């Protein structure tokens, strides 16, 4: 790897690190800053980019991964000979300069936006293709022509294969499962209910589409109902969420132990999370406390880490 030198020898023939040069080297490796607020009133998050794929990363990982990269000889030996490399490594590890805020805050922002679904289309990303989905068609996009970045967690770890509707409705185990849980009891027997099935499919489509209308914010509530019209468990909610999680990064919270007054209640949520699932909430769960989260956004606070905000859109 060719790079400008971010080290020099002082008058005492000791290695010194040039901070501005170090920042440029980190950027060359793929590190960047990412602001969740357009007005930049909070500190940025940090990311690592490789091609069109971006991954959230904490400063300690930037330090560790950079050290490992240098140890592996990522910089060409004609620029950084092995003997000098050891001195540079010792200086970086001893001073922990990579962790200094003056260094990380100087990292440039991403040069392209993150992928955002629009009202009329959604994007999905597989190992072999990007897929653009609209009401009328499914279009394959070459990834080398994308003009945006994508979170690493959004890459679905399999190849995309377009399957016709008849095959889905006759051979897909997941479709059969959805059809079964959509059945309704009639005179002691279960009968197919196309309306309930279509509603369940629309519900999943809503969760898989990142676009959200500020004028019409929604939350999805899944409740099992017995043949007596009463709530009942163990009839498929968890499997539906598992299905969603195969396509979108989903965070599961224990609904019974979830406390709204806990400042760290969303500590499992990350900047690339797409769905938050509260599992098995109590009967008297106060849903009104979620109105601001549903209509505005989520503030995530972790112990010993700066909190950050995920806006509604």
Predicted segments, located by residue:
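N-terminal nucleic-acid engagement/recognition segments and initiation subdomains in replication
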Residues: 1-172, 180, 184
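P-loop NTPase catalytic core of nucleic-acid-dependent motor ATPases
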Residues: 33-52, 56-60, 132-272
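Alpha-helical scaffold elements adjacent to nucleotide-binding pockets in ATP/GTP-utilizing enzyme cores
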Residues: 65, 239-243, 289-293
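Conserved catalytic/switch belt of AAA+ P-loop NTPases
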Residues: 249, 286-311
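Conserved catalytic network of the ASCE P-loop NTPase/AAA+ motor domain
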Residues: 267-271, 283-284, 309-313
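Hydrophobic "anchor" residues on beta-strands that sit immediately upstream
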Residues: 275
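Walker B catalytic acidic pair
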Residues: 278-281
């Amino acid at each position: 790897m060719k790079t400008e030198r971010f080290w020099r020898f002082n008058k005492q023939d000791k290695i010194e690190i040039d901070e501005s040069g170090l920042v440029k080297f980190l950027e060359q490796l793929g590190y960047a800053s990412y602001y969740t607020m357009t007005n930049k009133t909070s500190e940025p998050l940090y990311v690592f980019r490789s091609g069109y794929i971006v991954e959230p990363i904490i400063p300690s990982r930037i330090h560790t991964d950079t050290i490992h990269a240098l140890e592996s000889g990522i910089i060409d030996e004609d620029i950084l000979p092995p003997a000098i490399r050891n001195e540079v490594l010792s200086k970086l590890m001893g001073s922990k300069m990579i962790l200094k805020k003056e260094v990380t805050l100087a990292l440039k922002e991403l040069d392209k936006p993150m992928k955002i679904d629009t009202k009329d289309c959604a994007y999905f990303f597989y190992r072999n293709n990007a897929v653009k989905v609209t009401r009328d068609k499914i279009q394959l996009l070459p990834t080398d022509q994308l003009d945006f970045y994508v979170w690493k967690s959004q890459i679905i770890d399999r190849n995309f294969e377009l399957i016709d509707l008849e095959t889905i409705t006759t051979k897909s185990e997941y479709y059969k499962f959805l059809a079964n849980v959509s059945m309704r009891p009639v005179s002691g027997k279960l009968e197919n209910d196309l309306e309930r099935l279509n509603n369940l499919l629309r519900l999943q489509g809503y969760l898989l589409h990142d676009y959200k209308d500020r004028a019409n914010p929604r939350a999805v509530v899944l409740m099992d109902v017995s043949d007596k019209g009463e709530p009942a468990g163990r009839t498929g909610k968890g499997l539906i969420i598992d299905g969603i999680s195969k396509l979108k990064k989903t965070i599961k919270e224990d609904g019974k132990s979830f406390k709204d007054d806990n400042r760290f209640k969303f500590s499992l949520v990350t900047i690339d999370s797409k769905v938050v699932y509260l599992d098995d909430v109590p009967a008297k769960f106060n849903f009104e406390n979620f109105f601001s989260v549903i209509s505005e956004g989520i503030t995530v606070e972790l112990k010993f880490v700066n909190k950050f905000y995920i806006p509604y859109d």
